Swiss-Prot record:
Belongs to the SWS1 family. The keyword Transcription does not apply. This is Zinc finger SWIM domain-containing protein 7. One of its GO terms (cellular component) is nucleus. It comes from the Eukaryota. It is found in: Nucleus. GO terms for biological process: double-strand break repair via homologous recombination; protein stabilization.
C-alpha cells in the first residue's frame, strides 16, 4: 500500500516536476510555496539536493531505498514508498509530535526525484539487506 502525502504537497511536487521537465528549472513561485509549507526545512532540503547528497540504491528484486548524507555527515536511510526516514527529527517531529509531515531528508528525496538529481547505485539483494541491517545496528 502506497502512503500518500497530503494533496497540496503531492500537487506541488507534480507541478514542480512538470516545470523541471519543461524548462529544466524550478520557478520561484514553487520555491516560495515550498518555503511556506516546510519553513527552513525547504532551504535545508534544497541544499542537500544541490550538494548531491541523495543516493537511490536499488536491487535486482526491485527494492529501492534512498540514502541521504545529512549536513552533520551522518547518512540516513529514507523509504519514499512508505514515507519514512531514519533520522531523529522524523521520529520526533513527524511521528511523535506531528509538527511536520516531512523531515528535510525525506523532502530532499522527493525534490531530487522531481529534479532528477539522485545519484544511482545498483547493488545485490544481499548488499541491500546488509545496508539496511547496518542502519538498524547504528540506531541501536
Amino acid at each position: 500500500m502506497a502512503v500518500v502525502l497530503p494533496a497540496v504537497v503531492e500537487e506541488l511536487l507534480s507541478e514542480m516536476a512538470a516545470a523541471v521537465q519543461e524548462s529544466a528549472r524550478i520557478p520561484d513561485e514553487y520555491l516560495l510555496s515550498l518555503k511556506f509549507l516546510f519553513g527552513s526545512s525547504a532551504t535545508q532540503a534544497l541544499d542537500l539536493v544541490d550538494r548531491q547528497s541523495i543516493t537511490l540504491i536499488s536491487s535486482p528484486s526491485g527494492r529501492r531505498v534512498y540514502q541521504v548524507l545529512g549536513s552533520s555527515s551522518k547518512t540516513y536511510t529514507c523509504l519514499a514508498s512508505c514515507h519514512y526516514c531514519s533520522c531523529p527529527a522524523f521520529a520526533f517531529s513527524v511521528l511523535r509530535k506531528s509538527d511536520s509531515i516531512l523531515c528535510k531528508h525525506l523532502l530532499a528525496v522527493y525534490l531530487s526525484q522531481v529534479m532528477r538529481t539522485c545519484q544511482q547505485l545498483s547493488v545485490s539483494d544481499k548488499q541491500l539487506t546488509d545496508i539496511l541491517l547496518m542502519e538498524k545496528k547504528q540506531e541501536a
